Every structure is written in C-alpha cells, then in structure tokens.
C-alpha cells in the first residue's frame, strides 16, 4: 500500500480517524459530567450487566484488577455507580448504576444519537443500515486477527 494514499485506501486508517473524531466529540459533550471516554464505557457495561463484579469488568475490558478498581472508585466517587456487598460472598462486591448514573446514561444515549444522526444525513436509510451491518462484521474480525 502506498503511504501517500493511506488515508483513502486503508480501512484501519479511516477507523482510527473516526475513533479520534468520536473521542473528541464525546470528551467535549461529557466534560460537564467529568466522564472520560474510558469511564463511560464502564458505566454502559455496568448498566447492561447489573450486579456484575470487579472481575467481570476486568475480564470484559481486558485490564488488570488495579486499573478496574481505580476506575470503579472514580465512578463511585462521582455518584454514578454503587458497590453492594455480594450476598453470596462477603469479600466481593456487585456493581450497580445509581439514579444519577441512569440520568447520565440517558444523556450519553442522546450524545451517541446526535453523532449517529449527523452521519446518517450522508446516507440513505438502506446505505446506513448496510454500513452498520458491515462495521459489525469488521468489529467481529478482531478475534480472528488476534488468533493468527
């Protein structure tokens, strides 16, 4: 591949730029909530996996437990999640999103929708659905590439 045309021919390059643009957009929109890009993914995961454990979160995001503990502590400090002692294991905690966290998740959903709607304007409904379908295929290739 010719590096002069990388920005036009490389899907990897395009995805990196898309990610950068989305990250900057989210940073701006989420600044009032003191949420970084990394933090809102944790909040979304905990919301989808009510009563998950710190180990579950570490496994999902492929990070060490110390990193997860720091991240969860920050979300708890800001009032977005709460740690509840696991009734089956007094040494473990279950994680839940608080009412404040639910409100922020609603705002995050709106932020995502606004971004999506901006992109949708460039495509017909059929083209947009096809784009999303194809991007899911690309996303799922990750596992196959890691196994090579």
Curated annotation (Swiss-Prot):
UniProt domain HTH marR-type: residue ranges: 1-140
Keyword annotations: DNA-binding, Transcription, Transcription regulation
DNA-binding stretch(es), residue numbering of this chain: 54-77
PROSITE patterns (UniProt xref): HTH_MARR_2
Single GO term (MF): DNA binding
Domain of life: Bacteria
Role according to the record: Transcription regulator that regulates expression of the bilirubin reductase operon (bilQ, bilR and bilS).
Protein name: HTH-type transcriptional regulator BilQ
Organism listed in the record: Clostridioides difficile (strain CD3)
Taxonomic classification: Bacteria, Bacillati, Bacillota, Clostridia, Peptostreptococcales
